[in-house]
Amino acid sequence: MGNALAVYRDTFPPSPTYSVNDVPDLTGKIIIVTGGNTGLGKETIKVLLQHNATVYLAARSPSKAKAAIDELRDMTGKEALFLQLDLSDLKSIKESARQFLEKEKKLDVLLNNAGVMMSPIEQLTKDGYDLQFGTNVLGHFYFTKLLLPLLLSTAKTTGEARVVTLSSGAGLMVDEIDFNTLKDSPARKKLGTTKLYMQSKLGNMVFSLELARRYADQGIISTSINPGTLKSDLARYVDSLIYKLILKIISYPVPMGTLSPLYAATYPDGKSLNGKYLKPWAREGELSKTATDPELGKELWTWMEEQVAPFESNAS
């Protein structure tokens, strides 16, 4: 009940005290934003470009990315850089990281923004995982893992590197990660697409906090984010007219959703944000007992390591 009340309150947050005008000058900073071709990702990139960051727009579709980059150039006069990334394909993720590592010698911020919400139950990743968990959690884990050596070397040089992972208040609404539902199975179909989405958002929280535990002493700052309920295309798979109407009523403009991720990515006292969960609008929130369970953190991390291990050899 407490989690449900917290989610309800966070759906109607107070007016923000933080704004995009508080973002510092980001000259010299290199940032990746996954899912940057649309919605919250694109709006976040716009602000980062306006504050002089070098930004890689990571997305699956070259044509959609190009259209977004052109639009961002028109709005900001700055050029985002395209990085092809399909988070539902582990082999593609490895290639994307390889391409980035060939181009850059540092990475200040990895903003794990991309996500899938309530996709049709029959949809799986290329490797056979539930599309929502496979994309939202496992895909971002593998991308982060591959870039971690560069993040660590950046932190050694500059004092810090940040990983900002988008979650949702929905992650507070479930009390476990059922590992039997992460690949196609009768248990997965029984759980249903809504709870699978909630479970993936819990997974984002658990991953982000476990990353903070493991690498805080090496300068990594890991934060999870509830950006708020936004008027974006994330809910494109929702087929309930009533639910769509409710979302329309309670949703906020997309630019509002940039406040928490921008705060986590650029707030000068970044170390104070390590392991934290930010809710709308750039306020510190409280994670559930499940999300903060260190045993679940270890279990999820170990499971994800096992899933990506076959792709770690040079032959893959």
Curated annotation (Swiss-Prot):
Coiled coil: none
Active-site residue list: 167, 197, 201
Top EC class for this record: oxidoreductase
Pfam families: adh_short (PF00106)
Gene3D superfamilies: NAD(P)-binding Rossmann-like Domain
Disulfide bonds: none
Superkingdom as given in the UniProt entry: Eukaryota
Similarity comment text for this entry: Belongs to the short-chain dehydrogenases/reductases (SDR) family.
Protein name, UniProt field: Short-chain dehydrogenase/reductase eriB
Provenance organism: Hericium erinaceus (Lion's mane mushroom)
